[in-house]
């Protein structure tokens, strides 16, 4: 009986406490009601202040700056770094290789080629993320002398978008994205496309990619595109407004340098990589004979040009 009475007393006290809290809150509400507008303005000001503080803290964390911003589309970046990759590598005691890239009205499409795992996709994602950060009003990890513009539209095609529900293959999904990009492309659009034309038979895939690339060029769209296709590299050399870029590779150490060099197409280093991982030499010889000496020699000459350019620079 005593336990029951004690429990009832506790419940009564808890209910009394809740009633008292409600009374206090009502009283406070009555006191502040005449100042509601001032309080809302103060709340908004504090939110803005916190946003500024968060931006400063974020900028310090990623090494971000407020670059020179132009009222027209332009990408003229030095020391650009992917912020997430930068933080991840710093934890491992490593450093990001900075990206230098320039696109303007005269040179508005960049075709990046080079070996797999050489940094092509990282370059693409770095451009996309930094540009989006800027347009969200955030500091960006680039050199202080970098110049950045504003794009009205950004479109991205990266990764495998195969859909079971929509019955779309990887290539079909890729083509659907290309179709939408052709519709939206204009001189204030930035397109980011990874492995352009991939996912299908190389001959028709490369031809389709070249035909679509011609439309982007005609519409003066800005674009950063990665590819292995030779015809797209030739397209860049033959058309104004389009430029090749190569991901550099150390042929002696057989490792990627993760540096983008604009002006020359890159090699896929297929023969060198196959030899490095131990593919039998007779298999490599057969592959070389099948593809033709001219193709292999052209790839070798391309490597020599890139090497010589690096030496003289």
Language model feature labels by segment:
Residues 7, 25, 46, 124-125, ...:
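Hydrophobic face of alpha-helices
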Residues 16-70:
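Charged, surface-exposed helical/loop "interaction arms" that form contiguous linear patches used
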Residues 10-13, 46, 313:
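Short amphipathic alpha-helical coiled-coil/interface segments
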Residues 1-37, 95-97, 106:
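Switch/coupling subdomain of P-loop NTPase systems
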């Amino acid at each position: 009986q005593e336990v029951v009475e004690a429990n009832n007393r506790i419940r009564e006290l808890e209910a009394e406490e809740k009633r008292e809290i409600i009374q206090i809150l009502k009283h406070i509400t009555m006191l502040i009601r005449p100042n509601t507008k001032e309080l809302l303005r103060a709340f908004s000001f504090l939110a803005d202040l916190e946003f500024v503080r968060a931006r400063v803290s974020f900028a310090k964390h990623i090494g971000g700056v407020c670059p020179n911003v132009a009222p027209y589309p332009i990408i003229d970046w030095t020391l650009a770094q992917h912020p997430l990759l930068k933080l991840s590598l710093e934890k491992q005691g490593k450093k990001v290789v900075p990206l230098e890239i320039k696109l303007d009205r005269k040179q508005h499409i960049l075709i990046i080629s080079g070996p797999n795992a050489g940094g092509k996709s990282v370059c693409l994602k770095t451009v996309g993320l930094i540009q989006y950060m800027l347009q969200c009003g955030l500091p960006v990890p680039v050199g202080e002398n970098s110049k950045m513009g504003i794009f009205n539209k950004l479109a991205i095609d990266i990764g495998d978008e195969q859909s079971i529900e929509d019955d779309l293959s990887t290539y079909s999904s890729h083509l659907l994205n290309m179709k939408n990009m052709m519709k939206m492309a204009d001189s204030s659009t930035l397109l980011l496309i990874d492995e352009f034309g991939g996912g299908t038979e190389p001959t028709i895939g490369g031809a389709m990619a070249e035909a679509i690339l011609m439309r982007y060029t005609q519409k003066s769209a800005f674009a950063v595109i990665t590819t292995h296709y030779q015809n797209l590299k030739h397209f860049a050399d033959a058309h104004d407004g389009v430029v090749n870029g190569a991901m550099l590779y150390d042929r002696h150490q057989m490792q990627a340098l993760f540096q983008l060099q604009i002006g020359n197409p890159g090699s896929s280093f297929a023969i060198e990589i196959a030899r490095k991982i131990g593919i039998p030499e007779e298999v490599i010889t057969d592959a070389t004979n099948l593809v033709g000496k001219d193709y292999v020699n052209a790839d070798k000459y391309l490597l020599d040009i890139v090497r010589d350019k690096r030496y003289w620079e």
